[in-house]
């Protein structure tokens, strides 16, 4: 899932990972969008999930506002938008991570457009969920996308 609405593009020059005041954050509309997505997921039976997030504040805030359970930070979900040299390594790391997980319950990864596009080929809008299925060959198959 791509984080919900956060006005702007990229991150400011003074970006610091552990300081939300230096980041592009969710707007009020983005917070409401995440809450609506959480309610919609609950209405179709996903009342709890394993939720993993990039360490970026806009992703953590999206994950928290879904209201589906505790959030675990997963650094391979961090954006590589400003460091494209990390694209291949990070994408392989997250693909291997997905393939090693027990996915008996719904699993939601909240991340960034560049990460999702590198992994799936899909260019998601803010708040869009890209559903993938693991294949026997340790790959991922696109099932579809969901955008409220």
Language model features with spans:
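Generic beta-sheet signal
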Residues: 105-111
């Amino acid at each position: 899932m791509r984080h919900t609405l956060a006005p702007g593009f990229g991150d400011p020059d003074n970006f610091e990972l552990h300081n939300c005041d230096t980041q592009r954050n969710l707007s009020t509309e983005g917070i409401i969008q995440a809450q609506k997505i959480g309610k919609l997921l609950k209405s179709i039976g996903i009342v709890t999930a394993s939720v993993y997030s990039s360490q970026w504040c806009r992703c953590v805030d999206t994950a928290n506002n879904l209201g589906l359970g505790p959030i675990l930070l997963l650094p391979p979900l961090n954006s590589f938008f400003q460091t494209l040299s990390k694209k291949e390594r990070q994408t392989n790391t997250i693909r291997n991570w997905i393939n090693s997980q027990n996915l008996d319950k719904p699993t939601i990864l909240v991340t960034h457009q560049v990460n999702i596009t590198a992994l799936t080929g899909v260019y998601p809008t803010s708040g869009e969920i890209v559903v993938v299925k693991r294949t026997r060959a340790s790959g991922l198959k696109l099932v579809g996308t969901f955008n409220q």
